[in-house]
Amino acid sequence: MANETLRLALQPREITGKKVQSLRDQGILPIGICGRGIEPYSAQVDEREFNKVINQAGYSGLIELSIPGQKRQVAFLLEVQRNSVTNRIIHADLRVVDANAPVELDIHVALQGENDMVSRGNAVLNLVQSVIRVRALPGDVPHQIDIDASSLTEIGQQILVKDLSLPATVEILDDVETLILTLGYPQAEEAPAAETAAE
């Protein structure tokens, strides 16, 4: 499912360097804006509003930027820096993209549904590949790639990249034979086999 475009109101930022701490003390987050075809510039945003938007968008959600004196821009979150003690976001970078040109992004895999064998303790799900590389127009980028965990009913069954079902507007760039998910024995059941082999 493609993303709903989120909106973020930014203000130009003139304060840089160590002085940006004064902004953080006021609940204002310093932002860096970059992207192909634009001159990088500094901005700032209300910290609470930013956290609200980013909690929904993550790294694959399209964000429409509103900046006084500038034309409409759309962007993806590129990077965040956090305080090592409090884990509070202290700086973020946004990457402006062309809404009409394809982008390449890593999209997280999300397991959906309940697997009966796992629930009974007879198996474990092994997520081998947690992100999938895709190419799509910014407005068509999926927020996540859902996989039905209940579809695996026997030990050894697998889900590969070629088994994924995505809209025609989204191109998967990973090798089609890449393993994503497998249903295996619980570790406790594998141990006896390993001991037998050792003997």
From Swiss-Prot:
CDD domains: Ribosomal_L25_TL5_CTC. Signal peptide: none annotated. GO terms for molecular function: 5S rRNA binding; structural constituent of ribosome. Gene3D superfamilies: Ribosomal protein L25, beta domain, Ribosomal Protein L25, Chain P. GO terms for cellular component: cytosolic large ribosomal subunit. Keywords: Ribonucleoprotein, Ribosomal protein, RNA-binding, rRNA-binding. GO terms for biological process: translation. Part of the 50S ribosomal subunit; part of the 5S rRNA/L5/L18/L25 subcomplex. Contacts the 5S rRNA. Binds to the 5S rRNA independently of L5 and L18. Belongs to the bacterial ribosomal protein bL25 family. CTC subfamily. This is one of the proteins that binds to the 5S RNA in the ribosome where it forms part of the central protuberance. HAMAP family: Ribosomal_bL25_CTC. This is Large ribosomal subunit protein bL25. It comes from Herpetosiphon aurantiacus (strain ATCC 23779 / DSM 785 / 114-95). The lineage of its organism: Bacteria, Bacillati, Chloroflexota, Chloroflexia, Herpetosiphonales. The gene is rplY.
